[in-house]
């Protein structure tokens, strides 16, 4: 089984329109709304290929029920760690001529209690001899050692570790020498 940990999931809205006119009212032709964030996307892709997966994600109080319902609809087993705040929303605007504009919110702040709840979620399932994937950009204000610390925790329970991130948090996570990057 491959367990994904998404600390900063998003509700992704994709909007199609012929032409985005800045400073004007724009009418869209098509909209889709999907559960996302790198780890969630990994679990969705694994599930599509028939690979057993389990998603652990941190959601703000506003957005947690939506994620729970959406992941249930696609039959992805999951645990949602609740945090104060609003789960981030990302908007992608696709214009008829091919231009793509993305607007990504920063996400919620993670407290030590929330990180401990993520560890509890890892302890609640069998991670020994399974893969744990830590994926995505860290939340604003999170210590850069967050992925490293969580990965060391998972490894101490016998998990194999994959890291999919960038920037200082990725560099810090490399100190624990993950099994896959």
PLM region spans:
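Residues at secondary-structure transition points
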Residues: 30-37, 86, 109-113, 145, ...
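Amphipathic, non-transmembrane alpha-helical secondary structure
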Residues: 44, 116-123, 148, 171, ...
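Conserved beta-alpha-beta core of the PfkB/ribokinase-like small-molecule kinase fold
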Residues: 131-181
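Rossmann-fold NAD(P)-dependent oxidoreductase module
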Residues: 45, 70, 149, 153
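Structural detector of well-ordered beta-strand residues that form the stable sheet scaffold
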Residues: 3, 54, 79, 133, ...
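Cofactor-binding loop segments of dinucleotide-utilizing enzymes, especially the Rossmann-like FAD-
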Residues: 5-9, 58-61, 83, 96, ...
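Glycine-rich phosphate/adenosyl-contacting loop at the front of the ribokinase-like
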Residues: 1-56, 65-66
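Conserved N-terminal subdomain of the carbohydrate kinase-like
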Residues: 24, 48-130
